[in-house]
């Protein structure tokens, strides 16, 4: 993997970081998570580690996957980098803080992918509809390739329709939309994640993998 300024950049606008040392057998499903608005409370364009707060219930979700030996993979769009609001250095600090907050709850993530490409960006990051940017499925497919995942059996949790579309296009069949509505997108069944009952349904799905 090419690195830039010490960061795990597979290309100028794509961060791919293995954040655990766990080895998974090929063919495992994964739990894909969006970051901002799903793991942590969304603050717009997050560049301040001190502002990071975990969303209620997310530690339980990750704990269930950790206990089942299910890879936990973060897939996050970060257009603020392309727009010049902050750089990879700020992203790294914020992301480290999010992972540290999870570690304080004794849960962990296995891989983080972040896409900085956006049509409103500048320079090498000014690419419209980049295949790695959700709703395109590139980050999920890249994680699937690197970890040997069974994408069809994998689950996703996100707070935007783009998360669900990316999952559908990557071949997943089950997703949960934070504060959203249930729906069907092709073969992807989308469940809402709004209350304790919805959370129990997600935990049961993870425990059944």
Q: Across the structure, where does each feature detected by a protein language model lie?
A:
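Short, active-site-adjacent cap segments at secondary-structure transitions
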Residues: 39-40, 79-83, 119-121, 163-164
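Short, basic/glycine-rich phosphate-binding loops at helix/coil junctions
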Residues: 39-42, 73, 113-124
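Active-site neighborhood of HAD-like aspartate-dependent phosphohydrolases
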Residues: 2-73
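Short glycine-rich loop/turn motifs that provide flexible caps or phosphate-binding loops at active sites
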Residues: 36, 43, 79, 83, ...
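Asp-based, Mg2+/Mn2+-dependent phosphohydrolase catalytic module
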Residues: 1-31, 88-110, 119-156, 160-209
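Short, acidic loop-to-helix structural element flanking the phosphoryl-transfer center
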Residues: 46-73, 82-97, 132-137, 141
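Short beta-strand segments at enzyme active-site cores
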Residues: 71-77, 110-115, 177
């Amino acid at each position: 993997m090419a690195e830039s300024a010490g960061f795990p950049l597979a290309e100028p606008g794509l961060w791919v970081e293995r954040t655990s040392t766990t080895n998974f057998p090929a063919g495992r499903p994964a739990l894909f998570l969006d970051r901002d608005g799903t793991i942590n409370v969304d603050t717009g364009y997050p560049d301040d580690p001190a502002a990071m707060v975990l969303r209620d219930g997310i530690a339980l979700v990750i704990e269930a996957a950790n206990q089942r030996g299910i890879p936990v993979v973060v897939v996050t769009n970060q257009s603020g980098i392309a727009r010049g609001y902050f750089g990879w250095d700020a992203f790294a600090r914020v992301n480290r803080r999010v992972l540290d907050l999870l570690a304080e709850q004794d849960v962990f993530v296995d891989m983080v992918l972040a896409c900085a490409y956006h049509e409103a960006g500048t320079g090498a990051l000014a690419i419209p509809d980049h295949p790695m940017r959700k709703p395109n499925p590139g980050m999920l497919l890249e994680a699937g390739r690197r970890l040997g995942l069974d994408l069809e059996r994998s689950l996703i949790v996100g707070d935007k329709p783009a998360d669900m579309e990316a999952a559908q296009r990557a071949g997943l069949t089950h997703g949960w939309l934070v504060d959203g509505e249930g729906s069907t997108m092709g073969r992807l069944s989308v469940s809402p994640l709004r209350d304790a009952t919805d959370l129990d349904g997600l935990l049961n799905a993870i425990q059944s993998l």
